[in-house]
Swiss-Prot record:
Coiled coil: none annotated. It is found in: Cell membrane. The lineage of its organism: Bacteria, Bacillati, Actinomycetota, Actinomycetes, Mycobacteriales. Changing residue 57 to A: Loss of transport activity. It is a multi-pass membrane protein. CDD domains: MFS_PcaK_like. InterPro entries: MFS, MFS_dom, MFS_trans_sf, Sugar_transporter_CS. Gene3D superfamilies: MFS general substrate transporter like domains (1.20.1250.20). This is Gentisate transporter. The chain crosses the membrane at residues 42-64, 79-101, 108-127, 131-153, 166-188, 198-220, 252-274, 289-311, 318-340, 344-366, 378-400, 410-428.
């Protein structure tokens, strides 16, 4: 490379390219967190802010299910179908907007995702019937699905490789933080008004639209500047597309990443969507049911910290095997009808394991693929994997509609977590094989 960073530090701009024949890492000045500062840090933090609202939007439907069922006289099967619409949109958004972030640029993909997510989540508050509500949730899901791979790809381009796993963990910690906010807010807001209580929960989507987007437009660097900055620090990558994920070098790794994400998200999003309703069906009051949801999300926040440490020390895939195994065993323990205190502990462990495993998978994908494939690879894994998120609410509703009881759901979610551990074990084995035959550098 023949370009270098300006002496003043900060992000490279087009005017600085070609200024010198030497290549060096861009200097960071000011407050530094995990190796970045200045505009890079501001861009990454606004991305994290958006992920918090991504997490809020994922959990908010579960907190208002009972109110929707009462207002529109909905069955469990119909509630499951409506719950799946957002996840179906997420699956599509993750694949196509993830790819768009590689082709058009990170900034455009992030801002476009937030715009779609915020506008159509807000419109859910004014839905006159469940069918319009479901349509708005589907379109909002397109933005939901595109946001996480786009933000993670942008973050991976802006942070040093040595702190990439830690930053991936920070990014995804926003999901359970947002979910916790949804659970706490619902305790007060949903019972406050029979007509507008649940609707107000969706008006919160105005915050990223009104507050976040203007800041993002200012602090997220241009796509050309992000690419130039990354090329100077990490080297230039040739253009690549979906087909490159399935060539010999990446084929089985890509397939198993998608399978691992499928079963992990089936467990995580299934719980996030149905836990309040399941606990109410099991005989707990609405307030207690939401507190269980809060425990699940607080466990996921704790899991973000624990998996950051474990992923850095032992590798994301190896740590993911343990995390998913813990979640699976914990969820199956609910079949023993434990006391309330034990239920809280079990759900905290389930949050640590399910969401923590997904964070570790994202970190492994970001570490494994080159920059020109990173957004596409994240979109592939999250897009195909989110079919599990689509299936989970529908299956959970059907299991209840078939009178198979609450425990049938816990069996499904617990088994999914154990299958995630199995899939990651296969990836761990493939990693060892590929590191010999292809010299692939994937942190295990």
């Amino acid at each position: 490379m023949t370009s270098h960073a300006p002496e003043s530090g900060g992000l490279v701009t087009e005017s600085t390219l070609g200024a010198s024949n030497s290549s060096q890492t861009i200097e960071n000045k000011g407050l530094t967190i995990l190796g970045i500062s200045g505009r890079r840090l501001a861009a990454v933090l606004i991305g994290w802010f958006f992920v918090i609202f991504d997490g809020y939007d994922l959990i908010v439907y579960g907190t208002v299910q009972s109110a929707l069922a009462k207002e529109w006289n909905l069955s469990s099967a119909t509630l499951g179908t409506i719950g799946s619409t957002a996840f179906f949109g997420m699956a599509i958004g993750a694949v196509f907007i993830g790819r768009l972030s590689d082709r058009v640029g990170r900034k455009a993909a992030v801002i476009g995702s937030v715009l779609i997510l915020s506008v159509f989540t807000m419109l859910c508050a004014f839905a006159p019937n469940p069918w319009v509500f479901g349509a708005f949730r589907f379109i909002a899901g397109l933005g939901l699905g595109g946001l996480v791979p786009s933000v993670n790809a942008m973050t991976s381009d802006l942070v040093p490789r040595k702190t990439m796993s830690a930053w991936a963990t920070v990014m995804m910690s926003g999901v359970p933080i947002g979910g916790s906010i949804a659970a706490v807010l619902a305790l007060v807001v949903v019972p406050s008004s029979e007509e507008w209580g649940w609707r107000f929960m969706f008006l919160i989507a105005l915050i990223p639209l009104v507050v976040g987007l203007p800041i993002a437009m200012k602090v997220i660097p241009s796509d050309k500047a992000i690419k130039a900055d990354h090329d100077i620090r990490e080297g230039h990558d040739e253009p690549a597309g979906f087909k490159d994920l399935l060539v010999d070098r990446y084929r089985w790794i890509s397939i198993w990443f998608a399978l691992a994400t499928f079963v992990t998200l089936l467990a995580w999003y299934g719980l996030g969507t149905w836990l309040p309703r399941l606990m109410e069906t099991a005989g707990y009051e609405f307030g207690h049911a939401l507190m269980f949801t809060l425990a699940l999300n607080l466990g996921a926040v704790i899991g973000s910290v624990v998996t950051a440490w474990a992923g850095d020390r032992f590798g994301p895939i190896r740590s993911g095997v343990i995390a998913a195994g813990i979640a699976g065993i914990a969820l199956l323990l609910l079949l023993t009808y434990p006391p309330v205190t034990a239920v809280y502990v079990i759900l905290i462990l389930a949050g640590v394991g399910t969401h923590g495993t997904q964070i570790l998978i994202i970190a492994a994908v970001a570490n494994f693929y080159p920059s020109n494939l990173r957004g596409t690879a994240l979109g592939w894994a999250l897009g195909v994997g989110r079919i599990g998120a689509v299936v989970a609410p529908q299956l959970a509703g059907l299991l209840l509609a078939w009178n198979l009881g609450v425990n049938s759901n816990f069996i499904m979610f617990g088994t999914a977590a154990l299958l995630s551990a199995l899939a990651l074990s296969v990836l761990l084995r493939l990693q060892k094989t590929y590191s010999v035959t292809h010299k692939v550098e994937i942190q295990g």
